[in-house]
Amino acid sequence: MIWKSLFSALAILTHILPALTAPALDSELSSQSEDKYVFAHFMVGIVKDYQLEDWKEDMTTAQSIGIDAFALNCASIDSYTPTQLALAYEAAEQVNFKVVISFDFAYWTNGDTEKITEYMKQYAGHPAQMQYKGAAVVSTFVGDSFNWDAVKQNTPHPIYAVPNLQDPAEATTGPAKSADGAFSWLAWPTDGGNSIIPGPMTTVWDDRFVHFLAGKTYMAPVSPWFSTHFNTKNWVFVCENLPTLRWEQMLSLQPDLIEIISWNDYGESHYIGPYSAHHSDDGSSQWATNMPHDGWRNLFKPYIAAYKSGAKTPTVEADEVVYWYRPTPKGVVCTGDTLSAPMGADMLSDSIFVATMLTSPGTLTVQSGNNAPVDIEVPAGIVTSNVTMGVGAQSFKVARDGQTILSGQGGLDVKDSCVHYNFNVYVGSTKGGDGSNTTGARGSM
């Protein structure tokens, strides 16, 4: 999606200062619902050829890690939107999953109230529709100035609107007051919109949303990555430790709802779902093909369970490592690309990132290319470590009490040459027990 930043520097300063005097988060979140749900942002616009079984496969895969619903991002201009929404609702009902319509206001307009109302009248009472506090959830991408009053008044079933607001201060003024809460898209280090800052990721935007919502529902964003390389948008956020850091923040904040960005947005490289052969290619295959992210689902699962239970730390039930790394060092000049390296690339580190998921302490050994092996003592639980990137194969091992409990090699070598810039990451995982490699391991591609 193309983020349309509506912030000016003055506006940011104007709204940040009041937020600094806001009450502590614990008190502001005390009225949250005991029922916590996790959604995943799903791009309907790239699945025009999906069949019922495709939807069911994605949904059961999402269910397996604790995701409750897909937020179905749909555009008004796509002729197949009605067909795919119908299939999504049918599939969700069959597998006991839920869905939410997320109107993408890069395409919908404030003049589409009647059309949006018709969709809500059609699906608000559907068995597969996600209900929250007795009402059908509806969301958006942008759409800050849309007034939900007419939709609510003309839909027999109660509506619970949680639109995406670009500026949290909008929650207290104008059309956004008609909503029941808000969803933030600011899941990466930023000063607002697409501005890129060195990081680290903080909860400053979450704090501001909670403050301005003043007790209304806050749906917080979680995203493991963001890199895109189109001629109209070409940047990468500093997001290297987000796969665990952002979840740690969520366990501390305990927001009302969470939306994972995303399930299948290959264009922005933050997908956690399988790379589907049945999607239409917008050019992102250049950086998403053979770059699996499946291992992140393994990593997210215990965090989702912890969030729903109100725990501050995740519970690890089996030993595993999940690793992610770029295919080239950031300074490599690609020979056949008409575009420059993504904006923000210089802020990244040339590192290999490894999340250990251990039932008890162990020694992580990482060898990156021709670099000497690096040993890191890691405690039980989930911990993210990193080592300097080296050109060549990437190998991972965990030992405990002098015995190797798991080992594996990444399925992608780091190279010092390239044709096109690719700041997406390769994600793999290796589980303990029989020492076998799992998702993203050598030979699985």
UniProtKB/Swiss-Prot annotation:
Its main location: secreted. Coiled coil: none annotated. It is found in: Secreted. It is an enzyme of class 3 (hydrolase). Induction: Expression is induced in response to the presence of B.subtilis. InterPro entries: Glyco_hydro_71. GO terms for molecular function: glucan endo-1,3-alpha-glucosidase activity. Its EC number is 3.2.1.59. It catalyses: Endohydrolysis of (1->3)-alpha-D-glucosidic linkages in isolichenin, pseudonigeran and nigeran. Residues 1-21 form the signal peptide. Hydrolyzes 1,3-alpha-glucan predominantly into pentasaccharides. May enhance the efficacy of fungal antibiotics by degrading bacterial exopolysaccharides. This is Mutanase Pc12g07500. It comes from Penicillium rubens (strain ATCC 28089 / DSM 1075 / NRRL 1951 / Wisconsin 54-1255) (Penicillium chrysogenum).
